[in-house]
């Protein structure tokens, strides 16, 4: 494929991610667009298909193919600058072995469109989770709620308000969180 291996990422051609409050992202690590707002699937005028075919997604795809580094992908660029294997690098190797993204990219290069057949999708429908991973936080894991009051000063005011909304909206301060999964095989990488 005629793409720059230094910047190319297969995720915008093969993946989409949502947040518990309905926000749609090009991947779980992506920063918001330049206007600071990701579309929300809970908005009746917008859906995953619209996002997948949006000019925003096509601009990101173009940048990655042409060797540019979109700011939305800065988390991966920062990791790579520090000699850490990023999600982009992992998925490039992983998906290359499975040939998951070759056809969508070839189709895109000809038509500037990726078919709405998303092979990898991450749907976060709520923040209820029975794990407390170190890289996570209350937006994505209810197990972090008990620690939130101790660490919230390290987050921005907007994040604090949003997390407080989740905590209070789900009555998580008073309710014990149920474990949803009892075995590891419920989780798919």
Explain the meaning of each model-derived region.
Residues 1-95, 120:
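Accessory C-terminal segments flanking Radical SAM cores
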Residues 26-34, 123-176:
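Canonical Radical SAM [4Fe-4S] cluster-binding loop centered on the CxxxCxxC motif
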Residues 82-119, 131:
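Recognition helices and adjacent regulatory flanks at domain boundaries
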